[in-house]
Amino acid sequence: MTLINPNIQESNKLKFKDESYLDFNSIKGGDIRHDWSSEEIKEILDLPLMDLLWRAQIVHRSYNPGYKVQLASLLSVKTGGCSEDCAYCPQSVHNETTVQPNPVIEVESVLDRARAAKDAGADRFCMGWAWREIKDGNAFDSMLEMVKGVRELGLEACVTAGMITDSQASRLAEAGLTAYNHNLDTSPEHYSKIISTRTYQDRLETLRRVRMAGITVCCGGIIGMGESVSDRASLLKVLATLDPHPESVPINALVAVEGTPMEDLSSIDPLEMVRMVATARIIMPKSRIRLSAGRQQLGREAQILCLQSGADSIFYGDTLLTTSNPEVEADRKLLADAGITANFS
């Protein structure tokens, strides 16, 4: 099937500086690339906005007819007290914020929250632990019970809990875990300005272990942490050269929290998030692009542009770990006003 009028086929090709082309007609035929360069991706990020939106929408409509959006709910099972020194995070023991360490939520309480999320319309339940890494023992056994319970409710189950061993990944897969989240946060070049307690290679190794266990990969990053556009292109390059691409790519905007080293950083221009989402959609056509933290500060119009140009999931609920999120009713109205259907798996 021809995606657009062949008479304007040449305008449906994006020319890069090295004289190569990205033919948007070929994407529908399964031409998924894993050899993107940072230069190519930056050229896409820098396109005139209307041109970028048009190209992204071609890909988005091709893979997501009807603009269906998955609603995911996120619960912080273990909040605060993390030994990592992530400069953006209010849960780090290195940052003097109002977030205090809390005990791990019990299994039944987590499953109650999962039921409530399902009743509210979510079909993916994500659980977060503020840990550097998973340790074997009672807490991990409880995590396995939570995963099994969430799956028995008919929900997808996602966990984010830091680094992981091969054995732990296998046990989570046996419990039915749908996805494991482990973000790269930023580019390899900018990474040392954000965190020193874990290497970039540590993160990539965690992703490898998740993939080898047969669990789908959820991996994205954060913009607005003082990085350049080239850094954003470099982050996307790392993601888009993974083979296969991550099934889920959360795109976050920094929420500057008082007491963190990034407390004084200004909010990004909402159109920067639109550009990031649109570019991610173009280079990773089959991945689910998740509009994640920082969504509240974007405004309705920018959120709709993100949904139009590539985002096909939002985190749904009043809180994301320790930061605020649009209220459930506001999200329902947003999706209804945009004519978007939720959910799909």
Curated annotation (Swiss-Prot):
Keywords: 2Fe-2S, 4Fe-4S, Biotin biosynthesis, Iron, Iron-sulfur, Metal-binding, S-adenosyl-L-methionine, Transferase. [2Fe-2S] cluster binds at C126, C158, C218, R290. It comes from Prochlorococcus marinus (strain NATL2A). Belongs to the radical SAM superfamily. Biotin synthase family. CDD domains: Radical_SAM. GO terms for molecular function: 2 iron, 2 sulfur cluster binding; 4 iron, 4 sulfur cluster binding; biotin synthase activity; iron ion binding. The keyword tRNA-binding does not apply. Homodimer. Its EC number is 2.8.1.6. Residues 67-295 form the Radical SAM core domain. Catalyzes the conversion of dethiobiotin (DTB) to biotin by the insertion of a sulfur atom into dethiobiotin via a radical-based mechanism. It holds the Pfam family Radical_SAM. InterPro entries: Aldolase_TIM (IPR013785), BATS_dom (IPR010722), Biotin_synth/BioAB (IPR002684), Biotin_synthase (IPR024177), Elp3/MiaA/NifB-like_rSAM (IPR006638), rSAM (IPR007197). Binds 1 [4Fe-4S] cluster. The cluster is coordinated with 3 cysteines and an exchangeable S-adenosyl-L-methionine. This is Biotin synthase. Pathway: Cofactor biosynthesis; biotin biosynthesis; biotin from 7,8-diaminononanoate: step 2/2. [4Fe-4S] cluster binds at C82, C86, C89. The lineage of its organism: Bacteria, Bacillati, Cyanobacteriota, Cyanophyceae, Synechococcales. GO terms for biological process: biotin biosynthetic process. Its cofactor is [4Fe-4S] cluster; [2Fe-2S] cluster. The gene is bioB. The keyword Cytoplasm does not apply. PANTHER family: BIOTIN SYNTHASE, BIOTIN SYNTHASE, MITOCHONDRIAL. It catalyses: (4R,5S)-dethiobiotin + (sulfur carrier)-SH + 2 reduced [2Fe-2S]-[ferredoxin] + 2 S-adenosyl-L-methionine = (sulfur carrier)-H + biotin + 2 5'-deoxyadenosine + 2 L-methionine + 2 oxidized [2Fe-2S]-[ferredoxin]. It is an enzyme of class 2 (transferase).
